[in-house]
Amino acid sequence: DTSEFDPLANKEYTEEQKQTLEQEQKEFLSQTTTPALEADDGFIVTSASFAQSTPSMSVLSGNISPSQTSDPITKAVRETIIQPQKDNLIEQILKDLAALTDRDLAEQKRKEIEEEKEKDKTLSTFFGNPANREFIDKALENPELKKKLESIEIAGYKNVHNTFSAASGYPGGFKPVQWENHVSASDLRATVVKNDAGDELCTLNETTVKTKPFTLAKQDGTQVQISSYREIDFPIKLDKADGSMHLSMVALKADGTKPSKDKPVYFTAHYEEGPNGKPQLKEISSPKPLKFAGTGDDAIAYIEHGGEIYTLAVTRGKYKDMMKEVELNQGQSVDLSQAEDIIIGQGQSKEQPLITPQQTTSSSVEPPQHKQQVPPITPTNQPLQPETSQMPQSQQVNPNLLNTATALSGSMQDLLNYVNAGLTKEIDSNKQIDLIKEAATAILNNEKSDIVEKQANIIALAENTVNNKNLKPDAKVAGVNAVLEIIKNDQNTPNLEKSKMLEATVAIVLNSENLEPKQKQQMLEKAVDVGLSLKDDASRAATIDGIKDVVIKSNLYTEDKGTMLIAVGDKVNVSELSNAEKQKLLGSVLKKGVEAQVLSPAQQQLMQQHLDKITAEQTKKDTIKKVNDILFDPLSNTELKTTNIQAITSNVLDGPATAEVKGEIIQEITNTVAGSSLEAQDKAEIVKGVGETIATHSDTSLSLPNKALIMASAEKGIAESKTNLPDRELMTKVLVDGIYEGKGGPEITKAVSSGIDNSNINDSEKEALKKAKDAASEAALDRDTQNLTEGFKGQNIEEHKPHDDIYNKAREVINAVNPVIEALEKSKEPVVSAEERIVQETSSILNNISKLAVEKVNNLRSMLSPNGNLKTLEEKKEESIKKVDELVKAFGTKSSTEEQQSFIKTNLIDDKTLSKEVRLQTIDKLLQEQKRAEAIENPSFKTEDVRVVSGKSKLKPISKDNPDIEKAKMVVGRDRVNIKGNIKIMGALMNARDIIQSENLNKSTPIKRE
């Protein structure tokens, strides 16, 4: 608490005045005799008519409040004690800033002090800003400054008490308190305080507590036994009489006696006249730092002054009530948490503790016998028996020291001294860490501490761990991380309060000069891990926001700040949080880092990549959900499903993501479709639609290489699906069909092979899928070749007036050669007519087109199948002839008509793996072989079998007994044939030919509709 340093006067001291004041202080300290009032309790009262009106300033904010007044006593305390102490403190802070490594921060704080001095000489804003606490605490560590502050306090109170004493003639001035013992109890005393008019203002009650000794630790680690202290029931509200009142109660030594008269220490309560004339508690003056011998409301206050321990006549609970009343009477809203913050600040030393000396004597105490003013403690004459649940035997470091729970019953400083003593003695880092964990557990399990005090104590423990010189760097990391783990596992601390502890711990770590950046990063990462493990998103967000702000405001170099933010982002990125929450947290870290200019371009790019990946994962998840909704919609048929999934595919391709991310999403789409429970043909149609959508997508928004990349991902999704291999083969085929129907180039088709190669399946499955892909490509190329041939059909180049583009092209050629023809005619050389020239040139063009088409198709095959899986046209022709011969030979092995008919259906009609041309050529050859040899040998004789089948010949029954056997008008040689079987086979062959010729190769296998 800095209340004793708050600006409470507007007076600016000149150098001469400062020297005079210092001289007065030295004189006061050198006095061998002093008035009796200095070492006694005293009070001063004034009536309303006597109080002087001076500007009053808030004890908390330091702002002048014109509506309130302050009497001369309060003003004197401010001017002779508080302001000189603040001046010396600022002087030390400026010295510390001059030596600070972070020159930017040092200059910023120096300017802050200088600029505020011009507006407010008391620097109320600076001292009231929690961000400046570390500079104040560091200055207070200076031994010379502490001596100065103590001397100012002693001399100042002497001056005030002497100046405003009744003995010096000051009306209503300070006078000793006349305590009167209660007859019924010698440890109870009381006194009535009256104003100068004789009206009672209040009755003060004093209770002396005599107890068996308990131990308090000093800053140097030595311990002092307290056997007696007192409590005074300071009034909170006064409503009896008018006037002002100042109660100045001397602090007692450790044995309960008053201090020597040359070093009195006072706790003063200032009650000033309020608007209704009644005294109001406006201010409390006490030495700094004020501590409490326990965590409950009944814990007694004590201070260390001049190397000695003094107890003050106020408990923690009473002090809380008094501070809340001060807030009320200063016109501020009452907030319990704010009041407790102030109390905790005064109750705990922020100064770096020293190691407790090893020669410390055994100090164990037992609970006081009166009202239990302090927590239960062990009697002096009994050995310490720590609870095993709090401190296992293996963790005991010094039997002459208190355990953590007992040490904490005194004060946080006692606990730190105990821990430091153990860390000094114990060289095993594991046992050192166990001791730190034990202390953290004791702090959080202390039922008498409120959450604010627990926060402050945990932070103090972390700071102590970081700064302890007996811990190796790795042990410091492990120690702080152990504290963070204790925070994580504590079941009683609310998540938002845990978040504050984590943030404060990171601030201590990052601003420490005793750690390397690597060690700081390890502790920061642990804090982030703990923060991300909190159970609600608000606490997680608060932790990350707080930590990133701490990083940016730390005294680290800019480069190190960027590294720390990257570490925060990495932890968020690898966490198990939802993608939506990751997006929010990582986005906020990136945004803050860019705004604060602590992230390098490379770091920004790296974090943006992580953010893009998370965004892609979320997009992928959302997309697949939509796809599943479509697939399992019972009201939509396959055609509608295909249309809707094509629309989703198109949206993905148009999205802002990279081609790689788009490929990942498309892969998930095809994988989801392939793995669905739909019929194989239904899945095939949907996949075909996806392939066609990719192939036909605008080249301006999606380049050809990116299309190929995405198409490979589409096939990979199919290949890696859990459906059976035949279904995957079918979907691979129709994916290729979709590419061709979408006019996709060979690069897109070739990408299908790449997708198969990159898939995580076994080699045999890869080979099967490649064959399916090549078969689809073969069929597509055959269609293209056939379409090219069909385009030439009907172009009778012998006609005098050819039509279509070929004729027009030939006409262009003739127009070009006409001048040559005319020149030849003039030379009277024989020439051909124009029409003949057209025919010749057209024939030449068609020959060239045919050659180019063959060459183009062969090149295309080579490109699509670099491994030679697709054959050239010449190779395909040879293969077709060979296959036809094999089929004809196989047919000849079938002896019965039924076997031959079955062969025709199975091998020529149903087997679609054979090309259309091979099957038709086989049928033609089989039909030729059905003709009789005599007819074949005599080409001039028309065989009747053709006319019979075509219906041009009239057949008559051979006999009345067999009317179904008709007489065939045909020449029969010496080897007679089975006329009836022959006719059936020829009919079956011609029927098969009709079926094959009617096949529509431009459409895939018909799909089942729902």
Swiss-Prot record:
Cellular localisation: Cytoplasm
Location of region: Disordered: 1-34, 347-396
Keyword Transmembrane helix appears in the UniProt entry: no
Biased composition (Basic and acidic residues): 12-27
Keywords: Cytoplasm
One GO location term (cellular component): cytoplasm
Polar residues bias spans: 347-372, 379-396
InterPro entries referenced in this protein's UniProt entry, alphabetically: Rickettsia_antigen_120kDa
Domain of life, per lineage: Bacteria
Pfam families for this protein: 120_Rick_ant (PF12574)
Protein name: Antigenic heat-stable 120 kDa protein
Organism: Rickettsia parkeri
Gene name of this polypeptide: sca4
